[in-house]
Amino acid sequence: MRKTKIVCTIGPASESIEMLTKLMESGMNVARLNFSHGDFEEHGARIKNIREASKKLGKNVGILLDTKGPEIRTHTMENGGIELETGKELIISMDEVVGTTDKISVTYEGLVHDVEQGSTILLDDGLIGLEVLDVDAAKREIKTKVLNNGTLKNKKGVNVPGVSVNLPGITEKDARDIVFGIEQGVDFIAPSFIRRSTDVLEIRELLEEHNAQDIQIIPKIENQEGVDNIDAILEVSDGLMVARGDLGVEIPAEEVPLVQKELIKKCNALGKPVITATQMLDSMQRNPRPTRAEASDVANAIFDGTDAIMLSGETAAGSYPVEAVQTMHNIASRSEEALNYKEILSKRRDQVGMTITDAIGQSVAHTAINLNAAAIVTPTESGHTARMIAKYRPQAPIVAVTVNDSISRKLALVSGVFAESGQNASSTDEMLEDAVQKSLNSGIVKHGDLIVITAGTVGESGTTNLMKVHTVGDIIAKGQGIGRKSAYGPVVVAQNAKEAEQKMTDGAVLVTKSTDRDMIASLEKASALITEEGGLTSHAAVVGLSLGIPVIVGLENATSILTDGQDITVDASRGAVYQGRASVL
């Protein structure tokens, strides 16, 4: 079962209900809407289709609104484009003009105050470089020298590496888009070009004004200033997106992999989800198969510890959107098989602080690995418990049971967490019982599996203080167990020694009213023994201990309840008999 989550950008190639259904079936967990393009009508229709497709499949698919952000762009060019030549001077004006080979203008009037002689200005995603020769604040102009030939077309992006620009945290357009997202009930906001913690707080204030504090903020780190201020940004954020496109323009390309690793590591330590984004399977916009480098890129992001991997143009406008998701699913699934979960847990343990929830999270992850648990099941009010366990990357899947569908969708971004809808409970026992049942319904857990359950106080979030090891199964009978062993096998019901001798086979579970010395030969073949007669000093108890097999005595009507050939598991430590094979300690 794949733990890494897949984020897909929805666009013209993927906006239909039919295509969205295929993407979800192929592995999409979160749908991203890029508000750099499209209007409210388009995005509203896409949100409606996403909800309809997810309802049809019964899946909790999150919706992420990606803002355009406070970017700098050029204005229009003469004849739609100009040819810039190496060594020629080019004036950048703060007043809008139609661009020529002598002068162009930009959308950000404050640029003249932010750059200085020697600064570098990059145009069109870094394809054309300019060196600042002089700044004339009075004329509102920047004199530059063109560093390489290139064609500059209308409204291209402008980057200023190493310069702290005084753009606002969010633009008026961003604010309108976010309010629209609130009205539509999106789950995540991914603000672009976040440079400092105050940028995030501006957005949080806007969410609070509209009573939408539950929407999570996943800032996109796309420049050096954002990298430098990462600790403060993370403190006020719910996660992070490593947006390698603009980041690779703002900082040297050779630094991007190192920054990616560092940002992922910081998110992992805090238990906050991190998305690795941009050009992951870029060639699949045109080709049905990825390059080997792209496959390695996806795998290495998973080895770094990313929670989610993102597709952009591949699913928004590419020719092979479904194949791209399937490819990402296959690479992620195979990469996860190669992870050393014990080593990851050991490293994470040394990287984080210690709260009660952290202590429980660590213990749960350790216990699940040591007992080879089939799953970790956690009833959760806010999703916090599930996230705190997920940060230790246990090998077992985490089934988070919550009554809140919004929390289920937000957990769609967290590695290894699979959310299920639960019911309100009035007591801890009721809550745990419901969680076990929902984990069975999910298909992740089946009867006989050993699971680790963790939870807190009913109705209170952030109070995780309980851990329980539990065998999921139909307990069909209980008596008094002798010893701590367990065994699995077919039942042989015998009323006396002669019948036992005739029917017993190696590895069968002998079920009888009582035993005596005439049954010793049959007992030596048995994997376990169950008697109706009770008593810790009974013949069955003493012989069972001497033979080293699990024994349950005092099980009322055992010879009537159990039938010949019935496969059961005998758990002496609990005195329980399970239907079928059960994973017991």
UniProtKB/Swiss-Prot annotation:
The keyword Cell membrane does not apply. Keywords: ATP-binding, Glycolysis, Kinase, Magnesium, Metal-binding, Nucleotide-binding, Potassium, Pyruvate, Transferase. GO terms for biological process: glycolytic process. ATP binds at N34, F35, S36, H37, R73, K156. It catalyses: pyruvate + ATP = phosphoenolpyruvate + ADP + H(+). The keyword Metal-binding applies. NCBIfam families: PRK05826.1 (NF004491), PRK06354.1 (NF004978), pyruv_kin (TIGR01064). InterPro entries: PEP-util_enz_mobile_dom (IPR008279), Phosphohistidine_dom_sf (IPR036637), Pyr_Knase (IPR001697), Pyrv/PenolPyrv_kinase-like_dom (IPR015813), Pyrv_kinase-like_dom_sf (IPR040442), Pyrv_Knase-like_insert_dom_sf (IPR011037), Pyrv_Knase_AS (IPR018209), Pyrv_Knase_brl (IPR015793). It comes from the Bacteria. This is Pyruvate kinase. Its cofactor is Mg(2+); K(+). Its EC number is 2.7.1.40. GO terms for molecular function: ATP binding; kinase activity; magnesium ion binding; potassium ion binding; pyruvate kinase activity. The record marks K220 as: Transition state stabilizer. It comes from Bacillus subtilis (strain 168). K(+) binds at N34, S36, D66, T67.
